């Protein structure tokens, strides 16, 4: 699932910058 999240990261940021901020901390912790 982590792989899918990382691939969708760029799409989320481009679609919703607000969501990217929320996912940023989550990604940093997951990585």
UniProtKB/Swiss-Prot annotation:
Residues in cross-link 2'-cysteinyl-6'-hydroxytryptophan sulfoxide (Trp-Cys): 12-16
InterPro entries associated with the record: Amanitin/phalloidin
Keyword hit for Isomerase: no
Propeptide span(s): 1-10, 18-31
Keyword Cell wall biogenesis/degradation set for record: no
UniProt keyword list: Thioether bond, Toxin
Cross-link (Cyclopeptide (Ala-Pro)): 11-17
Reported modifications of this chain: Processed by the macrocyclase-peptidase enzyme POPB to yield a toxic cyclic heptapeptide. POPB first removes 10 residues from the N-terminus. Conformational trapping of the remaining peptide forces the enzyme to release this intermediate rather than proceed to macrocyclization. The enzyme rebinds the remaining peptide in a different conformation and catalyzes macrocyclization of the N-terminal 7 residues.
Gene Ontology MF terms in the entry: toxin activity
Chain's role: Major toxin that belongs to the bicyclic heptapeptides called phallotoxins. Although structurally related to amatoxins, phallotoxins have a different mode of action, which is the stabilization of F-actin. Phallotoxins are poisonous when administered parenterally, but not orally because of poor absorption.
Assigned protein family: Belongs to the MSDIN fungal toxin family.
Protein name: Phalloidin proprotein
């Amino acid at each position: 699932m982590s792989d899918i999240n990382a691939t969708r990261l760029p799409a989320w940021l481009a679609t919703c910058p607000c969501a990217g901020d929320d996912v940023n901390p989550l990604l940093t912790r997951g990585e």
